[in-house]
């Protein structure tokens, strides 16, 4: 609900021209120890391609901007060789951990907008956040750090709006009367494939 609400604000121009974004997928110690996640040959990479892509996709979607001009990034393999690591899914085998444990990027878009990308499976941070975004525009900004927060100026004062996106206390349904977001996403994708156009 928060992503769809924020997307509508962005589409309606409520935040103005979006020129800065932050794509965040940071885990403290949540390295997936099953399957081929840790194998560079079979997986292709670590947290950047596993969870970082979701946060980046969300940010690009909010900004409606998919044309990068320049990208600079760094990857780290600083914590993967530790033992007794406090991982949420048990200790990993350092010998089999051949992908990065953290990756960061700086993206400049063709129109000059800038996006910071942060992703990790293992990073010494206090507040992990996964698949969230922050966008800043000329009329306001928004972040998902602790639920959706929209900031703007009203009557010469700084304001923060925290929309109530709950369903009104119905425990078995967390929507707001609109259609399930996964159904909307699938419908948009199918429409794009069938009618040969970019997803909307």
State the predicted function of each range.
Residues 18-21, 71, 116-119, 145-147:
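Beta-strand scaffold of nucleotide-dependent catalytic cores
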């Amino acid at each position: 609900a928060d992503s769809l609400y924020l997307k509508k604000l962005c589409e309606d121009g409520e935040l103005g021209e979006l020129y800065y974004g932050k794509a965040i997928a940071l885990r403290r110690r949540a390295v997936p120890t099953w399957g081929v996640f840790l194998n560079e040959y079979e997986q292709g990479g670590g947290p950047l391609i596993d969870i970082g892509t979701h946060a980046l996709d969300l940010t690009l979607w909010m900004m409606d901007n998919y044309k990068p001009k320049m990208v600079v990034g760094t990857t780290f393999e600083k914590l993967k060789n530790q033992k007794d690591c406090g991982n949420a899914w048990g200790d990993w085998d350092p010998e089999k951990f051949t992908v990065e444990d953290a990756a960061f990027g700086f993206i400049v878009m063709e129109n000059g907008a800038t996006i910071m990308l942060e992703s990790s499976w293992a990073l010494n941070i206090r507040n992990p956040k996964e698949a969230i975004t922050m966008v800043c525009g000329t009329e306001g900004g928004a972040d998902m750090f602790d639920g959706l927060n929209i900031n703007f100026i009203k009557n010469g004062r700084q304001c923060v709006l925290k929309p109530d996106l709950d369903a009104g206390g119905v425990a078995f349904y967390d929507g707001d009367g609109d259609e399930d977001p996964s159904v909307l996403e699938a419908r948009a994708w199918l429409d794009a494939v069938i009618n040969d156009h970019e997803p909307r």
